[in-house]
Amino acid sequence: MTQTFIPGKDAALEDSIARFQQKLSDLGFQIEEASWLNPVPNVWSVHIRDKECALCFTNGKGATKKAALASALGEYFERLSTNYFFADFWLGETIANGPFVHYPNEKWFPLTENDDVPEGLLDDRLRAFYDPENELTGSMLIDLQSGNEDRGICGLPFTRQSDNQTVYIPMNIIGNLYVSNGMSAGNTRNEARVQGLSEVFERYVKNRIIAESISLPEIPADVLARYPAVVEAIETLEAEGFPIFAYDGSLGGQYPVICVVLFNPANGTCFASFGAHPDFGVALERTVTELLQGRGLKDLDVFTPPTFDDEEVAEHTNLETHFIDSSGLISWDLFKQDADYPFVDWNFSGTTEEEFATLMAIFNKEDKEVYIADYEHLGVYACRIIVPGMSDIYPAEDLWLANNSMGSHLRETILSLPGSEWEKEDYLNLIEQLDEEGFDDFTRVRELLGLATGSDNGWYTLRIGELKAMLALAGGDLEQALVWTEWTMEFNSSVFSPERANYYRCLQTLLLLAQEEDRQPLQYLNAFVRMYGADAVEAASAAMSGEAAFYGLQPVDSDLHAFAAHQSLLKAYEKLQRAKAAFWAK
C-alpha cells in the first residue's frame, strides 16, 4: 500500500484512516461518508456521520481525498473524546445519577449554603478572569448535561502548563465560553496539541484582525509559487469569477496565521477564511481548503458585503457569527493598499514536539496561561486546550446572560405540561415566571432544555412565545392566548408543517370569534370545517376549552423516551461511557 506523508502529521494518511476507522468500528460506531465535494483542483471536503445518530457528524477538508477523509475522522475522534457531540443536550436522569457523567476523573463540588463558588474549583487567575467582581454563584455553574443540583458542580481536570498542576474547571464554563475552540485529535499527543494550539491562534488573530479592521500584507507571488497546488486552486477560483486575496496574517511574524479572502462580484460580497499552523505551507493550504469546506461554487453567494462601519464589524455578535459560519461583516480596511504590518515569510515548523514548544513560547511571551486536558480513552490522542483571554469564543458575562443551563430548573415542569391537570391560575403563573426570569420569546424550548426532539413533533418548532399561547389557553385567558397565537403565526409559521400552520389559522379564527358576543359559534361550524378540516376545528376547540391546550406536544418522561432522536444520542453516549469506564479502570 502506498504511504502518503503530509507536513504536520506524524503518520501516513493511509495508516491514520485505517486506524481511525478500525477504532470507530471497535467502539460500535457505524460511520458513513455522506457527501464529497471537489469544487476546484486540490480542494476536497467530506461530510461523515453516524448511521444510527444523525446528530453525530463532522466535516473534513484537505488538498487530496485521503487528506480530507483523515481530517474528518480526526475531527470525529476529537468530538467523541471531548464529548462535544453532546454539548447542547441534557443526558437524562439515569446518566445524571450514574457513576460519572462526563469522565471517571471528574470531581463534584457540592453547592454551598451561601451559594459561593466552592473551594477547589478554578485557580486564582481563573477566578479573577471569570469573576472579577466576585458575583458568580455556584448554582450558575451546574452543567447542562446532568442538570443535577443535588450532585453539585462538575469540575473537569486540566493541567496548568506553567507548573503542571491540576486545576478543576467547571464543565459549565467550558461549554458556555469555549464551545469547540481548542479541541483536537491526532496521531500523537504533540500532533494533537499543535493542532489545538494552532486553532486557538487562528481564532484569536482572526478576531483581532476583524475587530480592529487591520490591513494585512499580501503574500508575494514568488512565495505563493512555492505551493503550486494552492496556486492552481486559487487560479481556478479566479477563472470562475471569484477574485482571491492571500494575506500574511502573522501580524509581523508573531503568529502562525494566514488569511485568504474571496470576493463575489456577482453580488458584491466577500468571505474571509483563516488558517493556522507552524508550517507556512500547511497554514496556507488549510486556509484555502477551509474557504470551500462543505461548499460548491454555487454556494458562495451567502456572505455579506464589506463595510466602512468599523463599530459594527467590531461588535461581539459579528465575531460570534464569524466563529459559527464566517458569514459576518468584514471591513474594507482589510484590503487597503498600505498594510499595517510588513509581510514576513515566517516559519515556526519542526518536529511536532518542537512545534508544541515553539507555540507554547508565544503564549508565555504574552503572559497567557494554557490549560490542557489530554484524552486517550478511545485509543486516539485528543485534547481540549483552554487559554483564558485568547481562546474564549463568548465573554465571561455570558455565564450570567446566556448560560446554557439557565432553563434547567424548568425542564421537568415544561415536559410535564401535556397531560397536566393544574389549576388554571398555575398555567398563567408560569407565563409570569417566564417573563420575570427574562426568557426571550424567540428561544426554542428544545434548545433551552437541551432536548434532541427530532423534527416530527410540535416540540421541534416550539418557542417560548408559542408556549405562552398554549399556557394562556390552558389558563382560560383567551385574550392573552390570541396575542400569543398571532405572535406565533407571525414569527414561527414559516417553520411549521402545513398541518400545524392550518391548526393555528383555525385557532386564531376561533379566538377572534370568541370576542364577538353577538355571533353564535355553531352558525359558523360548517364553514370552518370546510375551510380548516374537522380535525383542526376539533383540536382548536379542545385547546380553547383548556381540555387539550398543548397541541402536538407528546408527554415526555425523565429519560426522554418520547424522542427517538434523543434516544439515539444517548445510545451513542453509552458507547463512550463504556470505553471511558474500561480505560480508567486499567
From Swiss-Prot:
GO terms for molecular function: ATP diphosphatase activity; magnesium ion binding. Disruption phenotype: Mutant shows a decrease in the ratio of methylthiolated to unmodified S12 and a decrease in transcription of a subset of genes. Disulfide bonds: none annotated. Residues 60-437 form the YcaO domain. InterPro entries: YcaO-like_dom, YcaO_C. GO terms for cellular component: cytosol. It comes from the Bacteria. Involved in beta-methylthiolation of ribosomal protein S12. Interacts with the ribosomal small subunit. This is Ribosomal protein S12 methylthiotransferase accessory factor YcaO. It comes from Escherichia coli (strain K12). The gene is ycaO.
